[in-house]
Regions:
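N-terminal lobe/hinge region of extracytoplasmic solute-binding protein
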Residues: 56-106, 236
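Periplasmic-binding protein-like
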Residues: 333-375, 428, 521-533
Length: 566
């Protein structure tokens, strides 16, 4: 039996500071700016609040239900509302939070978690193991809308897949509080002890448990098969804040939770998250002092602040890559690995990055798993990069491969590149077209509204397209998305790759597990060129000079320990 104990959050008392104050003239400027570009909210300089912070994000909210959410905008808020058994620190390391200690059985199949006796809900009620049991069973029986969010439960928890399937067949009449779950590996041994039984060892279970779906929710507030309650506010939470106001298209306001396990370390009393999709309006609001933090600025704005203390490059475990539909619904050319390899070799990633704004914003990515995801002894990406790559820019070899596949000036390869009409995607499309045409490929564009883009990709409606994905828990979360079973309509259909991922899931030794995932990544990217990695993401943000102490909770900005000065 392996026993794990960790200290809870180290005290951050040293980070506490004074309440922000600004001059009356600055306040009036901010108020006038707010009248034209923002919903009515407290200004960043409002001295009536004990300690407040205004943070602008780029998208509106879709849900604050932990069982349902998979979107970044929601996570900015959820990250501050809930604490789970574990959390990720700024370096991506797993730290205990509500979990005081845990044990793992010798066969790696049973995890026993002991909840801290100091863990309480915001209304003062004790956090219990049954809260976690209800939350997990509710997530498994929610319905089809959260299939992606519960993927880790289904993959690893004993009986979870069968339970979820039965719940979905019964529909909304299924009641997780009364339905038999004796065959599901989720149980409360007592009020403070949660036991999880796995169907196979999982070397990174505690990392998975940092995700939203593993957070506790209360049965008396979080109803089954519905998420409307999550926008209503005034429900108990376990994290540093509670939701006190929400308009999902405009803003969410969170106030300090005095019953949070580490409440003494929380320095910011209130945070307002503002939905501001217009990047220029967000930059203007920052300039006038109406907002303290701007998380959704353009590269051009970021370049204007380059070299200043106000520019914060937010690290993001996200990849930007090209997916090729090599399966049944794809074109004939995409089934030829030499053609796929030629398209990869024709891309000058360094030039692509330079045009987009430089590697401070978009570092080149050669493997599929991006930076920021832990490997064995280093990041997974650093370990992979150390072995080198064969798919480096080589237009001459690209031409040779195309010729060998029967494509030349008299019979050029013709492809259709699909992308969505937002962000940097149009610029990327134009540069890719130029690079591919330089090796004799004719390129047409298909630009699609962002709201329907991913639905079309899920249905296999593309030849080659841009794609992106963010995760923080394990390299396997990036790789397994291209297994046949994880795709709605497969664009990659390779039994060997499927088996490589399945075999990796069975490995309990961390070093061997990571080795197996590196081999799977090489098979996906280098050997078969099913996908073409292009870029990592670093999101540029602006932070006023009077704001100090912003950090990361996993891959999301975290402001609970911020202080503000004059």
């Amino acid at each position: 039996m392996k026993i794990f104990r960790q200290k809870m959050h180290e005290s951050r008392n040293a980070e506490r500071g004074r309440i922000m104050k600004k001059t009356y003239a600055k306040l009036m400027t901010a108020v006038m700016a707010a009248a034209s570009i923002l919903p009515a909210v407290p200004t960043a300089a409002d001295e009536t609040a004990e300690s407040t912070l205004n943070v602008a994000i780029g998208s509106q909210f879709t849900t604050f239900d932990p069982a349902l959410n998979t979107e970044t905008a929601n996570n900015y808020v959820l990250n501050h509302l809930y604490a789970g058994m574990f959390r990720k620190d700024a370096d991506g390391n797993v730290q205990n939070e509500l979990c005081e200690s845990y044990e793992v059985s010798d066969d790696g199949l049973t995890y026993t978690f002991h909840i801290s006796p100091d863990a309480k809900w915001s209304d003062g009620q004790q956090v219990t193991a049954n809260d976690f049991v209800y939350s997990y069973l509710r997530a498994l029986s929610y319905g089809a809308d959260n299939a992606w969010a519960i993927n880790d439960f289904v993959n690893f928890i004993e009986g979870a897949e069968e339970y979820s399937t039965a719940a979905q067949e019964e529909g909304e009449s299924f009641d997780c509080t009364t339905a038999d779950h004796s065959l599901v590996g989720i149980e409360a041994a007592d009020d403070q002890t949660l036991v999880l039984k796995l169907k196979a060892p999982c070397a990174y279970l505690t990392g998975l448990m940092c995700a939203n779906a593993w957070l506790p929710v209360r049965e008396d507030f979080a109803v089954q098969h519905d998420s409307l309650w999550a926008f209503e506010g005034d429900y108990p939470t376990t994290g540093p804040y509670t939701l006190t106001e929400c308009n999902e298209t405009e803003k969410a306001v969170v106030d300090k939770n005095e019953n949070y396990l580490n409440a003494d370390d929380v320095t910011m009393d209130e945070i307002t998250f503002l939905c501001m999709a217009d990047k220029d309006a967000q930059a203007l609001a920052y300039q006038t002092g109406e907002i303290d933090v701007a998380l959704g600025i353009s590269t051009d704005t970021a370049l204007n602040y380059e070299g200043t203390d106000e520019l914060w490059m937010v690290p993001k475990s996200s990849n930007y890559y090209l997916a090729i539909n090599s399966a049944e619904t794809g074109p004939e050319w995409a089934k030829n690995v030499d053609v796929r390899r030629a398209l990869a070799l024709a891309i000058d990633k360094e030039s692509l990055v330079d045009v987009l704004g430089g590697d401070s914003f978009y570092p080149v990515l050669n493997g599929f798993v991006p930076e920021g995801v832990a490997g064995d002894t280093d990041t997974f990406r650093a370990e992979g990069d150390a072995d080198g790559y064969t798919l480096t820019y080589d237009p001459d070899q690209a031409k040779e491969l195309l010729a060998g596949a029967g494509y030349d000036e008299s019979n050029p390869l013709h492809i259709t590149y699909k992308y969505s009409n937002n962000g940097i995607h149009g610029d990327v499309a134009t540069m890719l077209q130029q690079m591919w045409e330089a090796v004799g490929v004719e390129v047409d564009f298909e630009c699609v509204e962002s709201g329907v883009y991913y639905d079309q990709l899920d249905q296999g409606d593309f030849e080659i397209c841009r794609y992106g994905y963010s995760a923080e828990d394990s390299p396997i979360q990036f790789l397994e998305m291209w297994t046949t079973g994880m795709q709605v309509v497969p664009a990659v259909n390779d039994e060997k790759f499927d088996q490589m991922i399945e075999d990796a899931r069975q490995i309990s030794d961390r070093s061997e597990y990571m080795k197996a995932l590196h081999e799977a990544e090489d098979y996906l990217v280098e050997e078969n060129v099913y996908v073409i990695p292009l870029l990592n993401f670093n999101d540029p943000a602006l932070v006023q000079t009077y704001v100090e102490g912003q950090t990361m909770n996993g891959i999301y900005p975290y402001f609970a320990y911020v202080t503000v000065t004059e």
